[in-house]
């Protein structure tokens, strides 16, 4: 299985985010994201967490998925406001994904 490159994972997550954010985020968060994204926005691939089973109710192989966060960074370049966390399968033939939205 060819793993997603970081750029591919980021592009996929951002496309899904843009498509689904309106249905899953609070209007105030959407406004904040839109106003701040150019200056502070970030979409980053991070090390795949092993606690996704607690979030989605099923065990996953961290090596089979990419984890991507969409949010805003602070002045220390740390993402301190995460709007969505994505878990995206590396399997192009069965592109499975899960999203945890900001509450």
UniProtKB/Swiss-Prot annotation:
Highest taxon listed in the record's lineage: Bacteria
Alphabetized InterPro entries for the sequence: dsDNA_mimic_put, Put_dsDNA_mimic_sf
Coiled coil: none
Cited function: May act as a double-stranded DNA (dsDNA) mimic. Probably regulates the activity of a dsDNA-binding protein.
Family the entry assigns: Belongs to the putative dsDNA mimic protein family.
Protein name (database record): Putative double-stranded DNA mimic protein APL_1348
Source organism of this protein record: Actinobacillus pleuropneumoniae serotype 5b (strain L20)
